[in-house]
């Protein structure tokens, strides 16, 4: 992901020029693509689209499908694993869902006490090890026995990622355990708040983080990139509208008490939002 050279226009023209049929990109790319005027491009060659790197906001996937007629297939995996969850060919995609477990893995969502979460309950994505580690899982962290033991224990590999499972067995991402915000006794997953903000017409992309607060412990902060036509409106009135929008879209206590407008979000080379960098600046 080249922050200096990337433009959605350039990628879309490449898809048109080379008649690309299969396309994989991080959610960041799709977020910027849907801001373009699709009438300027012929993307009819696209047959199969996937995303990787981080969770995709459902509103982005739905908008892309409306514009192209192509569904985006999502999944979940780590450097330490192969594809753990996915919308495989035999699974109907649900926008925003990571899909269902890869048959080679015994995937569970667990509470901190290692008991199984109920459907709809948030917990940690874990892979049961059994007598032998499944093919595809890493063996250990190089020269880091302490870190290895921290993720391999109680008969499971612990991913450190939070999710919940719906009644049909689809998994939905909530965020890294380290990213969960504890505010006034509530546990708030950043991805749910980001999803709510992304449905507002003013927002291109956003990142939710926690900011220390002497009374609540932490408060929710939103770092927001606005669409060009809304940048002149950045101020208290728009902040209030965005806060009210989140209250309407999700539980009111999850709304961002702090909103900062920026020109761009810090990202990794693969296009993932670097929330840790935002937290460090706060």
Task: Label every PLM stretch briefly.
Residues 1-18, 29, 188-193:
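ATP-dependent adenylate-forming carboxylate-activation enzymes
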Residues 85-89, 110-111, 127-128:
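Short beta-strand-to-turn element immediately C-terminal to the catalytic PLP-Schiff-base lysine
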Residues 96-101, 116, 151-155:
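Short Gly/Pro-enriched turn/cap motifs at secondary-structure boundaries
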Residues 104, 115-150, 188:
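Conserved ATP/PPi-binding loop(s) of AMP-dependent carboxylate-activating enzymes
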Residues 12, 20-25, 34-94, 106:
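Gly/Ser/Thr-rich phosphate-binding loop
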Residues 23, 113, 147, 162-253, ...:
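AMP-binding/adenylate-forming catalytic core of the ANL superfamily
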Residues 45, 69, 104, 202-205, ...:
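Glycine-centered tight turns that cap/initiate beta-strands
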């Amino acid at each position: 992901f080249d922050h200096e050279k990337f433009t959605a226009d350039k990628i879309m023209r490449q898809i048109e020029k080379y008649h690309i049929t299969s396309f994989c990109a991080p959610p960041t790319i799709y977020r910027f693509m849907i801001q373009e005027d699709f009438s300027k491009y012929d993307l009819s060659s696209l047959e199969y689209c996937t995303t990787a790197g981080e969770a995709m906001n459902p509103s982005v996937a739905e908008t892309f499908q409306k514009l192209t007629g192509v569904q985006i297939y999502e999944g979940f995996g780590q450097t330490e694993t192969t594809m753990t969850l996915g919308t495989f060919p035999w699974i109907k995609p649900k926008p925003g869902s990571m899909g269902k477990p890869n048959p080679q893995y015994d995937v569970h969502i667990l509470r901190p006490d290692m008991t199984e979460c109920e459907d709809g309950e948030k917990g940690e994505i874990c892979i049961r090890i059994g007598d032998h580690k499944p093919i595809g899982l890493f063996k250990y962290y190089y020269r880091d026995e302490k870190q290895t033991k921290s993720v391999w224990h109680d008969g499971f590999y612990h991913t450190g990622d939070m999710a919940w499972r719906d009644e049909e067995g689809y998994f939905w991402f909530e965020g890294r355990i380290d990213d969960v915000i504890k505010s006034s006794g509530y546990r708030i997953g950043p991805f749910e708040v980001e999803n709510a903000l992304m449905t507002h017409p003013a927002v291109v992309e956003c990142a939710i983080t926690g900011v220390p607060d002497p009374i609540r412990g932490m408060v929710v902060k939103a770092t927001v990139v606005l669409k060009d036509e809304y940048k002149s409106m950045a101020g208290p009135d728009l902040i209030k509208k965005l806060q009210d929008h989140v209250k309407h879209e999700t539980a009111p206590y999850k709304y961002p008490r702090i909103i900062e407008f920026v020109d761009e979000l810090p990202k990794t080379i693969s296009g993932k939002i670097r929330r840790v960098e935002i937290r460090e600046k706060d």
